[in-house]
Amino acid sequence: LTDNEFNVEEELNLNSKVLHWVVPTKGAYETHRQINNLNEGMSHFDMMHFLKNKWLGWGKTKELVHVTYNGMTFDEELFRRQFYWNLIDPYLTTNVNGSSRVDLMVIMFLIANFFSDKVKIPTDDEGNLRYKLEMVAEANGISSLNAHDAVVDSYLMINLVRLINEKIPQLWKSAVSTATKKDFIVAINKEPFSMFAEIVKGQAFNYPVYPCAQNSKKPNEVLLVDLYFDPKELFEMSYSELKGQIGKSGAFKKIAINKTCLLYTSPSPRDTR
């Protein structure tokens, strides 16, 4: 837990015994380099309820922003399953006391496209962007010793966020101000356009986009139109032709607003005011 200046107020380092039905693997223990949970520690049930109570306690006096790295596909799903298994609200990180979340890896995609002169994104020998947490940290002078340990990775993220807030304050402000679905929808409809950024096969790409539809049956799905495409040509297309434009190389991009989105909502990405 940190304050608004990213000073650590409290640290958690929790372990539980391996679940009875889990078969430990050599590769997993080589990654996190700890074996004490084979025979020691609290039960998995007790650990998850301790974490729940701790997060709820923090949220009584603060509107929490849960920051992860690649959390949309790993951490979030992991926590939801663990909470659900132990009879806890699986959406604890997003639905309690104004809590929200930011996936820092997505922020790196935006940095690679618009702010690579401020924060470094490393490349390999072939010039492909590499954005693993420890690689980005090292490229910016942050030691990644003992990376993949949960506490160490948390400090890597804190130091990276502190750096981003120092070098690109408008980007971090944009990420936090659009960290909830409601605020995100307001932001992308208010600005003249937003910038969609991604990294594909090690290369950075970006597009000016604007929302054009929201799925009435699945309101978390929003359709964006790529403003690089000529709207006159789109208006002349048939329904089937328009449907064929939805996808990676088409005029329409589908996003999920219940996840950190690859969008920068500032009117001018390089505006440093």
Located regions from the model:
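Single conserved hydrophobic/aromatic residue that forms the stacking wall/gate
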Residues: 264-272
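Acidic catalytic cores of enzymes that act on phosphate-bearing nucleotides/polynucleotides
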Residues: 178-247
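Glycine-rich phosphate-binding "P-loop"
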Residues: 35-42
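Residue-level signal for short segments within beta-strands and strand-turn junctions
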Residues: 1-4, 226-228
